[in-house]
Curated annotation (Swiss-Prot):
PROSITE patterns: MR_MLE_1. It comes from Catenulispora acidiphila (strain DSM 44928 / JCM 14897 / NBRC 102108 / NRRL B-24433 / ID139908). Residues 1-22 are annotated as: Disordered. Gene3D superfamilies: Enolase-like C-terminal domain (3.20.20.120), Enolase-like, N-terminal domain (3.30.390.10). InterPro entries: DgoD-like, Enolase-like_C_sf, Enolase-like_N, Enolase_C-like, Mandel_Rmase/mucon_lact_enz_CS, Mandelate_racemase_C, Mandelate_racemase_N_dom. One of its GO terms (biological process) is amino acid catabolic process. Keywords: Magnesium, Metal-binding. The keyword Transmembrane helix does not apply. This is D-galactonate dehydratase family member Caci_4410. D-arabinonate binds at H235, E285, R306, H335, E362. Belongs to the mandelate racemase/muconate lactonizing enzyme family. GalD subfamily.
Length: 429
């Protein structure tokens, strides 16, 4: 075993973890830690970065709900120690160093841990400048961010009832989902025993789905009219050919986008799917690295990029990816349901409000407990979100309140583990 002690400086740090330049002031990162809370049942991971300036701290979203404990451990054991002692203004150098330091890089666990630090440093930067973060990114490109919400039911009528409620609240953009045999959706249960003569009677059949989805949107246009923008999430369960079949069947109903039509393992086929689809293709929430996002945009695989921004490493890489979108005519539609913390929403909004590539923003209505844990949580008004005008993200965390909602054994993995066909075979989630 090689003795590397001769490489260490007196503080115990490897020399390359400390920059060869002198900071213009004595401000330093003093502590980095993960905070896990679940005010709506889904674990949210937020990173807090404290500094030597008493009261100056930042928050960042590191939420990977299905592996929250792994992310929290990565923050506390690996990411944080490499940042302590650094000047919080050195965001690019700190995040690149930590990205390189694992040698095997990227992936949703390490990228979410890095995102928590990265976003927290941007929060600190905004507070030091006395500016909201979007002003650090170039300022406004629009007054507010237009959002979409979800309508889902076990029947077409139930789904459209929810859609009408959203329209009454001021939404112009609604994603429609329908439960069915073997598969529920967003709080709407699926039906059991749909295939009683099959080896797995409670299964889900793609053929039935391909018949039901066009019926849903035909009924939606008839009942909701033409003024509402409609979307749909496939959840990665189709082959490339099936994706094209569905897109063509939905063409008469003028969807704003069709989401996650194929599994990430098949993303090399997206350019051909998009070329054959009359409906805009929105993909990206399952991307876990910057190179994967770049390939989607560069190679013509998407019309709208749906990043889960913490899964690619935070604001720093996201703004670079979005710059590429601006140059290549791809629009954004960031992932942001209940498994994105209010801090993550604030980071999304900073990009949304400042980029000319903005398309849509997914939204979620947080419960009262989440507002208690995260003072400053943004609220949808007439189908729009407005960024905070306070310095940084404009979001705080009440750690006493957060402690009232510890994570428990999380059942979200039931759907994310996939569904089974009537023959018992496993399909993607």
């Amino acid at each position: 075993m090689t003795d590397a002690n001769h490489l260490l400086d007196p503080s115990g740090a490897l020399p390359q973890t400390r920059p060869p330049w002198t900071s213009r002031d004595s401000l330093r990162i003093t502590r980095v830690r993960a905070i896990v809370t679940a005010p709506e049942g889904q674990p949210l991971v937020v990173v807090r970065v404290d500094t030597s300036d008493d009261g100056l701290y930042g928050l960042g979203c590191a939420t990977f709900t299905q592996r929250y404990a792994a992310v929290a451990a990565a923050v506390d054991e690996h990411v944080g120690p490499l940042a302590v002692g650094r000047h919080p203004a050195d965001i690019e150098d700190i995040t690149r160093l930590i990205h390189y330091s694992s040698y095997w890089r990227s992936g949703p666990v390490l990228n979410n841990a890095l995102s928590g630090l990265d976003q927290a440093l941007w929060d600190i930067a905004g507070k030091r400048a006395g500016m909201p973060v979007y002003e650090l990114l170039g300022g406004r490109s629009r007054s507010a961010v237009e959002v979409y919400s979800h309508a889902a039911g076990g029947t077409i009528e139930a789904t459209l009832d929810q859609a009408e409620e959203l329209l009454a609240e001021g939404y112009r953009n609604v994603r429609l989902q329908l439960g069915g045999p073997g598969l529920g959706t967003y709080g709407a249960p699926g039906t059991l025993g749909g295939y009683p003569r099959s080896p797995h009677p409670d299964g889900w059949a793609v053929e039935q789905y391909l018949r039901d989805a066009p019926r849903l949107f035909a009924a939606a246009r008839e009942r909701l009219g033409d003024s509402v923008n409609l979307m749909h999430d496939v959840h990665s369960r189709l082959t490339p050919k099936q994706a094209v079949v569905l897109a063509r069947a939905l063409e008469p109903y003028r969807l704003s986008f069709l989401e996650d039509v194929i599994a990430p393992e098949l993303y090399d086929r997206l350019p051909e799917v998009r070329a054959a689809s009359p409906v805009p293709i929105a993909v990206g929430e399952q991307i876990g690295s910057v190179p994967d996002a770049v390939r989607l945009v560069r190679d013509g695989g998407v019309d709208l990029l749906r990043l889960h921004t913490s899964a690619v490493g935070g604001l720093t890489p996201t703004r670079k990816i979005v710059a590429l979108c601006e140059l290549l005519g791809v629009r954004t539609a960031f992932h942001s349901p209940a498994d994105v913390s209010p801090v993550g929403v604030a980071a999304n909004l900073a990009v949304d409000i400042s980029t000319p590539a903005f398309g849509y923003q997914e939204s979620h209505t947080y419960n009262d407990a989440t507002h208690e844990v995260f003072p400053g949580t943004r609220v949808v008004r007439e189908g729009h979100l407005y960024p905070a005008e306070e310095p940084g993200w404009g979001i705080e965390i009440d750690e006493r309140a957060a402690a009232k909602f510890p994570p428990v054994k999380f059942l979200h993995e039931r759907w994310s583990s996939g569904v089974r066909r009537p023959d018992g075979g496993l399909e993607a989630p």
